[in-house]
Amino acid sequence: MARQRLLIGTIIVAATSLLNLIPLEFGILGSPWPVGLLWAICGWSGLGPNLTTATLLFFLGLWVDILTAATLGTWAFIALSTHAATLVTAQYLGTNGLGRIGSIAVSGTIMLLIMTVFQVWRGSNFFFVGTILTIVSAIGLYHYVGFIFELSEDEL
């Protein structure tokens, strides 16, 4: 069952990443598609450290790199490092008390910090407010799609 849900989640993230090619935005919130990886990162962190999820996140990150014309490995690095930081945070905070939106808000904050550090380190232009709004829109959509991604160690 968990493998089927991993496959469905992978297809959803890969398909919504294709929406990067269309200039579709939600008003001031911008487009959530570049950080659609956040849904998988947050939902799949319930499995704990897992080679399958890390591999899927790596390849989804490469897929987003190709679609957004980013330097190859940028989104893969962001996805894997956000996933690792989310796992560590979930271990110390516990995800049960946070709920669906709380856990993705923590993951989104971690992703924002990693993206900021990565962009500053690379010395590239970085629209901070736009990135915050993009992550906020992905967090808002997670309320509707999160149940597809949420997995636990019991499902393995």
Predicted regions and their residues:
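Terminal, non-globular segments
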Residues: 1-156
